[in-house]
UniProtKB/Swiss-Prot annotation:
InterPro entries, A to Z: Yippee, Yippee/Mis18/Cereblon, Yippee_fam
Gene: MOH1
Entry-linked Pfam families: Yippee-Mis18 (PF03226)
Organism domain of life: Eukaryota
Similarity remark: Belongs to the yippee family.
Organismal lineage: Eukaryota, Fungi, Dikarya, Ascomycota, Saccharomycotina
Protein name per the record: Protein yippee-like MOH1
Domain named Yippee: residues: 41-138
UniProt entry keywords in alphabetical sequence: Metal-binding, Zinc
Native organism: Saccharomyces cerevisiae (strain ATCC 204508 / S288c)
GO molecular function, one term: metal ion binding
Residues holding Zn(2+): C45, C48, C101, C104
GO cellular component terms, semicolon-separated: ubiquitin ligase complex
Amino acid sequence: MGLRYSIYIENPLSSPSSSYKSINDPLFHSQHRSQKNVSFITYGCRHCKTHLSSSFQIISRDYRGRTGTAYLMNKVVNVVEGKVEQRRMLTGDYLVCDILCHWCKRNVGWKYLQSSNDDQQYKEGKFILELKNICKCT
């Protein structure tokens, strides 16, 4: 992998070793998932292909971002957080920050920091990846 990857993601079905290679400790672990008949996809920045997350980290595919369809993700890597701001969304007010690809600095989504609604607090610490800003990496 190129130097642009602090962490890169490898298909766990193709290698007997850990599926997440890192200079540091691995950040991802597919927990309690059967590896039979599971389609593994690595998602990256659409512009520079830096790895961001995997299909094993998707919580929901039923989200809308600024540019259209988005995924709610449990973990992402290789991003830097932008300025913290308050945003009004369909489900309430949130304290969020944009997340930028650490290599090319393009916006790929945002991180939920705090929710004003108790029933939306499960989103805190989770990430939105906008599909128009990401791609499938092979």
